Amino acid sequence: LPPTPPPPVAPIPDASWHAFVAECLAEAPVTGECTTWASGNNYGTMPNWDTSLVTDMSGWGTAAQGFYGKTTFNGDIGRWDTSSVTNMRYMLSVASAFNQDIGGWSTEKVIDMEGMLNKAPSFNQVIGSWNTEKVTSMRIMFVYAERFNQDIGSWNTTQVTSMHAMFRYAFRFNQDIGSWDTSKVTDMSLMFMGPGSGTSFNQDIGSWNTEKVTNMQYMFYHASAFNQDIGGWNTAQVTDMK
């Protein structure tokens, strides 16, 4: 007789995702291949999880959770079904070893990407095809994402209201984001702020719609490479440019 095929993997319950991440990574902190944990249920090891029911993959609620601060984690979670996820806030923040291909994730329901790859210095994967049409916050999304330099110029930013510190200290980032729709953005403070050693960003963003922006504080502080014509920007609502 042929061996009995393994049972289909059961979907992770939405309310259990954070607890299951903690339990699995306690056993297999780098890969998430928590075979002992998985032997006691029918969810499988982390790379094989069915996450189709999960809505909240955030890394911070009232405290660190999920992958937040999991500094050695570098598991292959690129096959996850994220089509129900609305919250990726701080999801991979301080996951300092993480550099896996997550470019195929379905992000069409995600509203919050605040700090998603904040302090993820190893990450440099192609994520340009993510559907960001519902995202309202990209603040501090790539802070200290020191290696990140991928084309995200086609992202839909029509609903984004905050880009505060989005690329702060992401000193290798230099991609064309000039066609982004920034018409709802109110906060661009610290957006391209660099360390004392400077940054690489020098792209034409002169056509950005800045009519709703109120805060541009330190927007280009230590952005040493930047030298583009932004003289046409509408700064009528800006109250802070220091």
Name each region found by the language model.
Residues 4-242:
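Negatively charged
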